[in-house]
């Protein structure tokens, strides 16, 4: 897997962590198995006895949902900015206290 795809997958995992509760149970289940358990769409389709195209549509819909919410709320972007700021803090005690507040 090249670096771009790896970064994209990592972002999808993080968006799922942030916005996953907004999905239906079925969407969350399929997306979790696809992204976090690294199952192929065909494996998920076989497991739940549905068409691969159905899984593809659910995954696509999840990504659209995440992108819409991120465009409005920018929780992922703000999280990334906070992490960059934490890295710049040199005082170990202050850094620990701020990390606990996350």
UniProtKB/Swiss-Prot annotation:
Top-level taxon: Bacteria
Query: By its UniProt entry, which SUPFAM superfamilies does this protein fall under?
Result: Sigma3 and sigma4 domains of RNA polymerase sigma factors (SSF88659)
User: Pfam families under this entry?
Assistant: UPF0122
Database matches in InterPro entries: RNA_pol_sigma_r3/r4-like, UPF0122, UPF0122_fam_protein, WH-like_DNA-bd_sf
State the function annotated in the UniProt record.
Answer: Might take part in the signal recognition particle (SRP) pathway. This is inferred from the conservation of its genetic proximity to ftsY/ffh. May be a regulatory protein.
Q: Which PANTHER family match?
A: UPF0122 PROTEIN CBO2450/CLC_2298, UPF0122 PROTEIN YLXM
The family annotation for this protein states: Belongs to the UPF0122 family.
Name this protein carries in UniProt: UPF0122 protein MPN_424
């Amino acid at each position: 897997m090249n670096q771009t795809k790896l970064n994209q997958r990592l972002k999808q995992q993080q968006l799922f962590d942030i916005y996953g509760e907004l999905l239906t149970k079925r969407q969350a289940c399929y997306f979790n198995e696809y992204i976090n358990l690294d199952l192929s769409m065909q494996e998920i389709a076989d497991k739940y006895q549905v068409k691969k195209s159905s899984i593809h549509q659910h995954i696509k819909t999840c990504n659209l949902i995440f992108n819409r919410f991120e465009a409005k709320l920018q929780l992922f972007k703000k999280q990334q900015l906070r992490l960059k700021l934490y890295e710049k803090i040199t005082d170990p005690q202050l850094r620990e206290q701020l990390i606990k507040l996350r």
